[in-house]
Regions:
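Residue-identity detector for glycine
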Residues: 7-8, 29, 49-50
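N-terminal secretory signal peptides that target proteins for export/translocation
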Residues: 1-12
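An N-terminal assembly and electron-transfer interface module characteristic of large anaerobic redox
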Residues: 20, 32-454
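Bacterial N-terminal signal peptides
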Residues: 16-26
């Protein structure tokens, strides 16, 4: 398939503003805070203090967590396990979720909390409310130095807490809750040690390990019963957020969908933190060398194109755009609009700038209530029909890549309406010459071009 794009100085402002706009828009499916490698944490910063007030005798530590929907499963699951192991009366966790508050606002009153853990969360008036709570004695810990500078301690200046949060995983999040209890001198609670969790790799639900690269993965996968050497290979590229938040059941659905369609999947997870370039070279070749096509819910960020550009050129396969929305599946299916306007930039525009094609909504965030804690959280839920459709499209692209150029059939469509400003010629495009150049290039690549342009 051929696509002609054109532009000029009138579009230059869009390219300059796009990186800024992407940072300001909500970003479904990924997180700005990333997992840190397992290493000895640095000593605490001199400005890193502890709790401002002592816990009331006989009362639990009251913790408010300010967050977004994608992080709620691990926070709730870990709290459930904490209560199971330590009982009630040690810690109370109250989640303030950006998307949930937007639908059902509640007064921003935080003075009753002993500690506020400020993660990524944007609620109007939140900063002022947190600052007021700090003046009343609440201990505010923020994962970013871009917010709450006047009242918060930076999480990374508290290595005993950061070691748990930055590495994620259910065990580490339980450990974070335990370490908070230690900070408030809760009797009977001793924090477990943090355990390293991979922040990049290849996942399969039937494997006992996360693979570092495709070479080791395919060596394992090809030894499985029923492996078809001639089946198409489909790469699935995702952010690491869901893996770090223990939502691997969603990964399993993605993998099984490809396997049920008769293809061989390889799912790789990874993430580039906003404003950083940590992590070295792009993992695309390491994960997906030899695949026929890639399905990706990555590339929401403009800086990712620069990071992956060389690897994409070397990989030289179609990359289909998978979209995860921060809305419930039923809400999306009942909407006449489909994709909300504030999702277009990071879900459609930015991925297309990176070369992704065929955007398809494949998942939403489903509100669920934990029966043990009574807390609401948001699971990533696959939209089955749409995902099956995208898998079929991916396999069609794989088949096309395996078809000789002379046997492919291509239609070139162009818009040309009346004369004047509406006409393509008024945009200073020489349509005839462009088509001739395209057809000549196709012929040079082995396509069978018949006839001539009149």
């Amino acid at each position: 398939m051929c696509r002609i794009r054109h532009g000029g100085e009138r579009f230059a402002w869009l390219a300059r503003l796009l990186p800024i706009a992407v940072l300001l828009m909500p970003h479904p499916g990924w997180s700005q805070d990333s997992a840190a490698p397992a290493e000895t944490p640095p000593e605490a910063s001199p400005r890193a203090g502890g709790p401002k007030r002592r816990r009331s005798p006989g009362k639990p530590v009251r913790l408010a967590v300010l967050t977004v929907a994608v992080h709620t499963p691990i926070l709730v699951r870990a709290y459930d396990r904490f209560r199971e192991q330590h009982g009630d009366g040690k810690l109370e966790v109250d989640l303030w979720v950006e998307q949930q508050w937007a639908e059902s606002p509640r007064p921003l009153e935080f003075g009753q909390y002993d500690m506020i853990l400020a993660l990524r969360c944007s609620i109007p008036g939140l900063a002022a409310a947190v600052s007021a709570a700090a003046e009343q004695g609440a201990w505010v810990v923020s994962q970013s130095d871009m917010q709450y500078r006047d009242c918060a301690v930076l999480l990374d200046d508290l290595p005993d807490l950061a070691a748990y949060y930055r590495q994620r995983g259910a065990d580490n999040m339980v450990g974070l809750y335990e370490k908070i209890c230690e900070r408030f001198e809760v009797p009977g609670v001793t924090a477990r040690l943090p355990v390293p969790v991979a922040d990049a790799g290849i996942y399969h639900p039937d494997a006992s390990e996360v693979f570092a690269d495709g070479q080791h993965y395919w060596k394992w996968y090809q030894g499985r019963p029923g492996y078809d050497h001639d089946a198409p290979k489909v790469g699935i590229f995702v952010y690491n957020t869901l893996y770090l938040n223990d939502e691997t059941d969603y990964f399993t659905q993605l993998i099984r969908g490809v396997e049920q369609a008769g293809a061989s999947p390889v799912l790789g997870f990874w993430f580039v933190p906003v404003g950083q370039n940590r992590g070295g070279a792009s993992p695309l070749k390491r994960f997906f060398d030899g695949v026929d096509v890639v399905i990706s819910s990555s590339f929401r960020l403009t800086n990712e194109k620069l990071h992956h550009e060389e690897a994409l050129l070397e990989l030289d396969v179609p990359v289909l755009n998978s979209i995860i929305l921060n809305v419930a599946r039923e809400e999306w299916s009942g909407s006449r609009q489909g994709i909300p306007a504030n999702y277009l930039l990071n879900s459609i525009v930015s991925p297309e700038f990176s070369g992704l094609i065929e955007p398809t909504v494949i998942a939403g965030r489903q509100p669920v209530t934990n029966p043990n804690t009574g807390q609401d959280y948001f699971r990533t839920v696959l939209i089955d029909d749409n995902y099956r459709w995208q898998v079929r499209r991916a396999l069609a692209w794989a088949t096309l890549r395996r078809t000789a150029a002379a046997d492919r059939r291509i239609a070139i469509l162009y818009y040309n309406h009346s004369g004047g400003k509406q006409n393509i010629g008024a945009s200073y495009l020489n349509v005839t010459a462009s088509l001739e150049a395209i057809l000549a290039d196709l012929a040079a690549r082995g396509y069978r071009v018949e006839g001539a342009i009149d």
